[in-house]
Amino acid sequence: MNNSRVEGSSGRAARKLRFALMGPAFIAAIGYIDPGNFATNIQAGASFGYKLLWVVVWANLMAMLIQVLSAKLGIATGKNLAEQIRDHYPRPVVWFYWVQAEIIAMATDLAEFIGAAIGFKLILGVSLLQGAVLTGIATFLILMLQRRGQKPLELVIGGLLLFVAAAYIVELVFSQPNLVQLSKGMAIPSLPTSEAVFLAAGVLGATIMPHVIYLHSSLTQNAHDGTRQERYSATKWDVGIAMTIAGFVNLAMMATAAAAFHFNGHTGVADLDQAYLTLEPLLSHAAATIFGLSLVAAGLSSTVVGTLAGQVVMQGFVRFHIPLWVRRSVTMMPSFIVILMGLDPTRILVMSQVLLSFGIALALVPLLIFTGNKSLMGDLVNTTLVKRIGWMIVVLVVALNLWLLIGTLLGL
């Protein structure tokens, strides 16, 4: 009886520790449902119905593994990915990594910031510039939570992630997808045309985000509760839950677009404004409003995460620190320039996703090298199977993103 009591109390302690260590993956998961994902998933669903849902499933499984490895690096070494690159690579390589990571962080932020501004424009009827001002104010307010520590920020961003998930549950109810076809689309790989291959590459490129690979390793590096194995076990739960929610949102985006647009003859829906305006007469004003609100929530939370990632990149690579409000002020300038110049915001959003393709392999390769290093990782070193899967992901991601890049440059 005493043994069962001890086992029960140790089980409760393990659950308590697991709960206490949850949060970092929810911040990272926001990067997987940013406005770039909205645009890509809507276009894929409108063009090909449920046929590309399997890409979302596999991309999400890859992303889960990548985020576990990133978090594990921070747990095992007490240093984030940028710091490990700084410690192990020659200075010119480190500076190259810093510059490309900053460019990619800004490109990511451009898409996220403009996405939130479009959301405000759609639901409030304001101009895109006014939407951008509202986005700037809102992100400053959210970033102020960082002064109170990481946990309040985790709670707010986790809440926004859950809001977007709830919004898409409602959208699925409104759109009433065919569950049999939906299940087939998730389970059976299909690439019916060259455009489908291009969109599949876009879905993968919009799913695996280099900036959250850097960020996640920094969010776990200073956790000291429990043993390393206990922290790693808790992290796997954290990633599993957060990334499952993010994966559901991506599936729901594509399934809603398929049910609402593709099967109603609107196969050419390709941008966020058009999706909003098409949803209203097809489903209802409420469905369109919920879409707009979810876009705002995803844009705001992901642009905050992008700002945090940029801070980690700068501090990790070059040991230079600037206040978050200064970084936020500087990184939102390109968005205002794009808007003031009257450029097509959705086109800019898609182009920024293409730019991200350069950074994915650059983040993944050192991550796999470091997490496969026994002297660095100790008992948390990657197994042979994980190493093989990791390098297969690198090859696949590089190949598909090269396809995406070439197709974009050639106007395919």
UniProtKB/Swiss-Prot annotation:
InterPro entries: NRAMP_fam. Signal peptide: none annotated. It comes from the Bacteria. GO terms for cellular component: plasma membrane. Keywords: Cell inner membrane, Cell membrane, Ion transport, Membrane, Symport, Transmembrane, Transmembrane helix, Transport. The keyword Ion transport applies. GO terms for molecular function: cadmium ion transmembrane transporter activity; manganese ion transmembrane transporter activity; metal ion binding; symporter activity. The keyword Signal does not apply. The chain crosses the membrane at residues 19-39, 46-66, 94-114, 122-142, 155-175, 196-216, 241-261, 290-310, 329-349, 350-370, 389-409. Its main location: membrane. H(+)-stimulated, divalent metal cation uptake system. Belongs to the NRAMP family. This is Divalent metal cation transporter MntH. The gene is mntH.
